């Protein structure tokens, strides 16, 4: 049987695509859930708030810690594992990152981290999460069990999600669907970039326009919230509807900002709408540490 050059090309392309897909996937199989209670004995347990407990046991029921102590009694149907001398640490949570959303930064087809417009408060990071990312095993080997991922972009970027890192797909991985709304705060510096140098007046004007636009978005979202509370909304606007939980105080507002002026502007907006504010980045947060503490504003420090 003879194969045409076209067929051979198609086979080669298919083989290449399959090998490429395999190269972007890890071979770790998610652990099987324990059948019934699980008792681990003889451990050195490093707790979050109660120091280190030696020669201790831990009882896990329905995937959650039910008891910690010495000489715990095993339920009748429990599996008992003697782990004498082993150390047990709580899993770490990686905050405000894009694990599973970006595989190779230089390859656009592996980047599912952002949308193209400025108003995406209804975008959820979980949908773009790749549970088969090659990066995940490395992160897990360093003690991380969870990751709070967020969609990138400008202004209203979208909703972050808390994911557990031992999963087949994003549906299995989701722990908390919406952990908060992420906003990239407009530039406050009057210096142009070296790639796009502009006079200070032009930069200042552009900054003011972007800040005014962001304030308009929040005004529209607050108007939608007020109408919702009064039962006057006649339809659903998915953008502002997803922000209802932020105005209700059920979810925090994560503002990505480094400059002191940006942080102050974000604090004013949070105070105006009575929002739970968390600063992400926070390079200059040390300059107003007392004010942040007084306003109960949390900081996820990621700035170099």
Q: Where would I find each of the regions flagged by the language model?
A:
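Bacterial N-terminal signal peptides that target proteins for export
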Residues: 1-10
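N-terminal signal peptide c-region/cleavage motif recognized by signal peptidases
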Residues: 16-20
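Histidine-rich, glycine-flanked metal-binding segment
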Residues: 30-32, 45, 49-89
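Metal-associated gating/positioning segment near the N- to mid-region
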Residues: 86-142, 147-150
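Polyanionic/metal-chelating signatures
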Residues: 142-277
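Glycine-enriched alpha-helix->loop->beta-strand junction motifs that scaffold or abut catalytic
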Residues: 270-276, 293-300
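Short, acidic/turn-prone active-site loops that include or flank metal/cofactor-
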Residues: 282-284, 302-304
């Amino acid at each position: 049987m003879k194969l045409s050059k076209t067929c051979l090309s198609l086979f080669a392309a298919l083989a290449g695509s399959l090998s490429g897909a395999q190269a972007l996937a890890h071979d770790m199989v998610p652990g099987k859930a324990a059948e019934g209670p699980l008792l681990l004995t003889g451990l050195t347990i490093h707790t979050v708030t109660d120091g280190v407990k030696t020669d201790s046991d831990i009882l896990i029921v329905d995937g959650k810690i039910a008891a910690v102590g010495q000489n715990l009694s095993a339920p009748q149907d429990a599996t008992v594992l003697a782990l004498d001398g082993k150390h047990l640490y709580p899993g770490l949570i990686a905050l405000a990152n894009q694990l599973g959303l970006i595989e190779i930064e230089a390859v656009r087809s592996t980047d599912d981290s952002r949308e193209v417009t400025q108003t995406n408060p209804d975008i959820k990071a979980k949908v773009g999460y790749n549970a088969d990312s090659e990066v995940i095993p490395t992160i897990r080997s360093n003690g991380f069990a969870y990751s709070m991922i967020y969609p990138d972009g400008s202004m209203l970027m979208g909703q972050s999600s808390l994911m557990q890192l031992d999963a087949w797909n994003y549906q299995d991985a989701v722990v908390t669907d919406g952990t908060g709304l992420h906003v990239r705060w407009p530039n406050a510096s009057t210096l142009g970039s070296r790639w796009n140098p502009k006079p200070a007046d032009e930069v200042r004007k552009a900054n003011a326009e972007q800040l005014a636009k962001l304030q308009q978005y929040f005004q529209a979202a607050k108007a939608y919230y007020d109408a919702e509370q009064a039962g006057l909304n006649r339809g659903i606007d998915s953008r502002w509807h997803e922000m209802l939980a932020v105005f209700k105080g059920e979810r925090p507002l994560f503002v990505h900002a480094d400059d002191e002026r940006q942080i102050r502007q974000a604090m004013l907006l949070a105070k105006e709408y009575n929002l739970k504010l968390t600063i992400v980045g926070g390079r200059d947060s040390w300059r107003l540490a007392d004010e942040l503490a007084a306003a109960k504003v949390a900081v996820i420090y990621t700035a170099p």
